[in-house]
């Protein structure tokens, strides 16, 4: 009996040792292959990052992957191997080779970490090009000019609520954050927060038929954090897919995963309730995004969206429509209150074009404000809502990306934050200069002064990608610009604004962004005085 027990223990020990040796050998083989035999081995980059995806994962968890990629391109050049199978390309030609029309690349496996229901994809995370085309054709009906104009009243309602908050009027929740104050004739607000409340209220009403009322009540403001946490979880899992496919997220990033699930359940409840209400309302239902999602069909197949697809599209619309707009508006005010000359130009343009605030609506008059558009573009350049590199996978046959051949299966992408700071495309790239977008305008940086040429504007446009480009570019771009134009113009028309403090500012004087796939931000704190 004793001998048998000893032999059994030795046998188990031997098996364990054997497995350990096998694991070490497999790991060593993986590292040696990545370093010396991988087809991407000749592309420069940090040695450790070429051995393991965990370096990139570390920066994803830390929230500074966009800054890390920027530093890598500064050190290694246009093409950088940032992970064993990921190449970051920081050129305008590379941008168009990767994301442009007719290219032999598709969304990477990264996006399989996003679906809330496995196998149910939306316009954002669908990898298959045919599937994406069907979904986009259905969704595009909600973004026609006619449809957007019909939704403008919802947006204007909430913009008016925001203006009332900034004017310090009664009737809104006065339990502000500790950093916010009300003084004689002025209020101080953290506009990173308040723009989030605005955009979530707008998109909540358009996507689910009911506002979250964040502008007037604290009740659902926690949803902003939940959405950010959900995006962060998707991002981290996409950077190392075993977290998702092996369910390791439930062990190593447990709280992120719980918060993501809380968001999923909240949005599922909202979508189910709205679908029932719409069915009861019939023809009387208001024509918002949910109306179009329920009723739109693919013009080629005649098919609409299933209930799970409907929920998925409403989810992604709410997130994408909120994050891009709130980040851009926060960035615009961040830089404007630090550049009094730019703020004065914008104020003069808006106040010279309109006599009453209610005249400021979408349309030709607003679209003719050249400096307003330039301010928004410059905010999008310096503070992109998705600052990292959105990954694409090279399809069969390989692809040449700005002169470098990448074999099938390679993941690659262009980091928005990095290319938007490339001196080759943006002179004095670290300076907020709306004039760079206006042909004939005078640009003044710390050590240079020049007149913007048509060639410079064209060069800047070619490298500009805040909404991505090509067939997978953001379908809601027109909606975002409409909301940003109207909101910023009304604020500039109604208020005198000034810098309150340095909250949200990084060491270089820019708006500090945290890369959670979408950008998280804090601030700016702005002083508002009603005119």
Language-model segments: residues:
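Cytochrome P450 C-terminal beta-domain/meander region
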Residues: 74, 80, 300-308, 361-378, ...
């Amino acid at each position: 009996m004793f001998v048998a027990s000893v032999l059994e223990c030795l046998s188990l020990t031997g098996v364990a040792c054997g497995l350990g040796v096998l694991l070490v050998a497999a790991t060593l083989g993986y590292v040696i292959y990545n370093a010396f035999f991988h087809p991407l081995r000749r592309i420069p980059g940090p040695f450790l990052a070429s051995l393991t995806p965990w370096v990139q994962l570390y920066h994803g968890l830390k929230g500074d992957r966009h800054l890390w990629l920027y530093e890598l391109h500064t050190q290694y050049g246009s093409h950088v191997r940032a992970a064993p199978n990921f190449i970051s390309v920081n050129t305008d030609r590379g941008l168009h080779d990767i994301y442009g029309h007719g290219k032999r690349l598709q969304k990477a496996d990264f996006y399989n970490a996003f679906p809330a229901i496995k196998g149910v994809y939306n316009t954002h995370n669908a990898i298959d090009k045919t599937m994406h085309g069907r979904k986009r054709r259905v969704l595009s009906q909600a973004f026609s000019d006619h449809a957007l104009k019909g939704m403008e009243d919802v947006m204007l309602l909430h913009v008016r609520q925001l203006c009332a908050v900034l004017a310090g009027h009664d009737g809104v929740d006065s339990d502000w954050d500790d950093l916010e104050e009300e003084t004689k004739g002025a209020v101080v607000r953290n506009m990173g927060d308040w723009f989030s409340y605005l955009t979530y209220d707008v998109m909540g009403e358009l996507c689910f038929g009911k506002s979250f009322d964040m502008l007037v009540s604290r009740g659902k403001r926690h949803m902003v954090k939940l959405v950010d946490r959900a995006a962060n979880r998707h991002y981290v899992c996409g950077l190392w897919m075993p977290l998702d496919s092996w369910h390791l997220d439930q062990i190593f990033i447990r709280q992120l995963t719980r918060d993501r699930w809380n968001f999923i359940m909240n949005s599922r409840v909202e979508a189910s309730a709205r679908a029932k209400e719409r069915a009861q309302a019939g023809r009387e239902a208001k024509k918002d995004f949910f109306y179009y999602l329920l009723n739109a069909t693919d013009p080629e197949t005649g098919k609409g969206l299933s209930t799970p697809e409907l929920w998925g599209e409403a989810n992604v619309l709410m997130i994408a429509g909120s994050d891009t707009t709130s980040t851009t508006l926060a960035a615009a005010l961040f830089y404007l209150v630090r550049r009094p000359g730019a703020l004065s130009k914008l104020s003069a343009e808006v106040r010279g074009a309109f006599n009453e605030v209610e005249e400021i609506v979408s349309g030709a008059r607003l679209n003719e404000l050249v400096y307003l558009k330039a301010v928004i573009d410059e905010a999008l350049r310096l503070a992109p809502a998705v600052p990292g590199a959105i990954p694409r996978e090279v399809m069969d046959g390989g692809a040449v990306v700005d002169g470098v051949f990448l074999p099938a299966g390679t993941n690659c992408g262009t980091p928005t934050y990095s290319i938007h700071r490339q001196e080759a495309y943006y002179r004095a790239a670290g300076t907020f200069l709306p004039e760079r977008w206006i042909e004939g305008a005078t640009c003044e940086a710390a050590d240079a002064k020049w007149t913007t040429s048509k060639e410079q504007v064209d060069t800047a446009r070619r490298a500009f990608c805040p909404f991505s480009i090509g067939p997978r570019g953001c379908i809601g771009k027109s909606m975002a610009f409409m909301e940003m134009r109207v909101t910023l113009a009304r604020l500039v028309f109604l208020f005198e604004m000034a810098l309150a403090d340095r909250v949200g500012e990084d060491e270089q004087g820019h708006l500090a962004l945290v890369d959670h796939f979408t950008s998280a931000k804090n601030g700016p704190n702005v002083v508002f005085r009603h005119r």
